[in-house]
Swiss-Prot record:
Location(s) in or outside the cell: Secreted
Tissue: Expressed by the venom duct.
Name by which UniProt lists this protein: Conorfamide-Vc1
Protein's organism: Conus victoriae
UniProt keyword terms in alphabetical order: Amidation, Cleavage on pair of basic residues, G-protein coupled receptor impairing toxin, Neurotoxin, Secreted, Signal, Toxin
Family as reported in the entry's similarity comment: Belongs to the FARP (FMRFamide related peptide) family.
Amino acid sequence: MSGRGFLLLALLLLVTVEATKVEKKHSGFLLAWSGPRNRFVRFGRRDMQSPLLSERLRL
């Protein structure tokens, strides 16, 4: 895996985990934080709607 691809994956994972943490307080947090990066918004929404994936990321 290239360094850039790994960095992007790590950033995506971090954003997803952070979004899961604040999900109950700020449901639109990831959407507002991402701005023009629609890819992150899509992944974040899908992860938020999937309790199993969210639990797996927390472990």
